[in-house]
C-alpha cells in the first residue's frame, strides 16, 4: 500500500497501494491483529540495466536497425537472450519524447514467469537507447506442468493465502469460474471488494530456482494484493505485491501545499483543454454536475466501503463548487463539500500537468474515455474524501491500465480540530504520483515493478519530489528547505526524517544511508533528497518557471524545474522492472541524453554524486558502496 504515513502495520508491502508516511517500524498487513510482516514477502532485486553509454560499447547491437521499433526491440531480445521463450506485452507505445517503450514477458511451457521481464527503449533514430532485463536464466522445469497437472487447485491456493496472510476473506461455499486457460475467478466469497482471481504462473526465486505458483489477487480495500502461493505447497507464499496513488471551484490554488501557504480562491474552468478536452465534468458520453468526469470521481466515503458510485458528492446549481471551509471548522463532515471539491481539483490538475509531461493515454494514464489516443480506458481515479477506513494517512491503489486507480484521503487527528488530508495538496500529489510511477515503471500493463525494498522506496521518493517541485515559490533558492506533511501532521518536522535541503548540515542523507534503512518511506527520503539536488542544479542552469504549466521549446521544457520533472518522469519509463538507485540514476541520464542530447549530464551527475551516487557507486542490498566522483568531463 502506498501511503503518506505508515498506517499501523502497513508499510512494508511491495508497494502498490501507496501511503504517505513518516518513519515507522510497523510493517504488518493493514494493522490487523495477528497480521504478518509483509517485508518477508518482498521480491528481490533481479534486474540489470544497460545504459546508453554501455550500449555504445556494443556496436553490433547498438547499431542494429531494421523496420519498426517493435521489430528492433524484438530482435534485440532474440540476440541478447537466444533460445529464450517470451511474449510481447501489449502495452508498447512511443512516448512524447520520441522513445519507443517495448516490454516482453518470459514464458516457460507457455506459462508466464511473472517477475521475468525485458524492457527495450528505442530512440528517435530507430536504434536501441537502453534496455533492462530480469529474465530467468536458471534450469528449466523438465516437463510441462499442464500435462500431469500435479499442482494444487486454485481454491486450495485461495484458502492458503487467506490463512497465511490472515486475510478477512471467507470462501466457504465459493466456486471457481474459468476466465482463460491459466486464470480463474472465485465466485461466492465475502470480505473482498471484488471477486478474487487466481492465475497459474512461475516465479523466479532469489536462490536462482523457479517456482510454479498461483497468483491470487485479492482487493480488501486498504490492501490490493497479488500473493504468489506455491502450486505444490498450499502453505508456502513466495512473494506478495500490493497495488495499494463553465464551472467555478473554490479551492487552494495549485502551488499551495497546504492552508498555511495562502487563501482559497474561486477559479473558473480551471481545466486545460489541451490535456482534458472533455473538461473535468464530462467523459464524452455524459456531462456531470457533480465531482465526476473523465479523469476522476470524488465522493464522501465515511464508512470506508467500496460502493463509491452511490456515495454522496456535491452537485451544486449552476456548477458553482463554492463551499465554506476553514481549518478551525469541526467536525470534518460539516465541510465535506469543500473537501470533496478540493480533492477533485488537485487530482485533476495532477492529471493535466502529468499529461503535458508525458503521462498520456499511451503511457497508461487514468481516464474513462481515451478518445482513440491509445491505452486502455475505463480507469479514472476513484477519490474518497474523509475515508472512514483509517486515520492519519492517505493511500493510492494502482492496478494495471484499464482498471480504476483508488485514492483514500483520511482525517488526521494530530491536531485539534482534526485536519483533512484533502486540503494538503502535497499529500494528494504524493499519492497521485504513485499512480504515475507504477504505470510507467514496468509499463501500463504491469503494476508490479516497484516492489523490491529500494524500488519501493523510490516510489515514495518520487511522490515527495513532485509534491515539493510543485510547491516551489518565486523567491525560493537552493537554500530553501521544505518539510513533508507538516500541516496535516501538526508538526514542524513533518513526516520525514529530515527536511528536503541541499545543505548537508540540515539533511545529511547519502546513498549509503540506505544500508541502515529497511522501510520504504525512509529510503524514499534519501531518493527525493538526491532529486532535490538535481532539481536545483537544473534550476541554477536554466532558471525556474513559476507558472502552473511548462513551456516547451522543441519538446523540451525551457526551465530547470519542469525539465527536472520531465526527465525524472521519462526515466521511470526507461528503467527496468524493480530498479535500484544506480539503475534509476542511469535511466535519468539516458532520458536527458534522449531529450537534450546530454546537455545536462554534468548537472545531473553532480547532484547525485553530492549524495554518494556518483561514478563507482554500487548496489548491494546489504552493503551499498557510495561514491562522490563524477565523470572526468564534469570535473
UniProtKB/Swiss-Prot annotation:
Residues of the propeptide: 20-246
UniProt-annotated catalytic positions: 431
Pfam families per the UniProt record, alphabetical: FTP (PF07504), Peptidase_M36 (PF02128)
Cofactor: binding comment: Binds 1 zinc ion per subunit.
Presence of keyword Acetylation: no
Cofactor(s) the protein needs: Zn(2+)
UniProt keywords, alphabetically: Glycoprotein, Hydrolase, Metal-binding, Metalloprotease, Protease, Secreted, Signal, Virulence, Zinc, Zymogen
Top enzyme category: hydrolase
Extent of the signal sequence: 1-19
Binding annotation for Zn(2+): 430, 434
The protein's name: Probable extracellular metalloproteinase 1
Origin species: Arthroderma benhamiae (strain ATCC MYA-4681 / CBS 112371) (Trichophyton mentagrophytes)
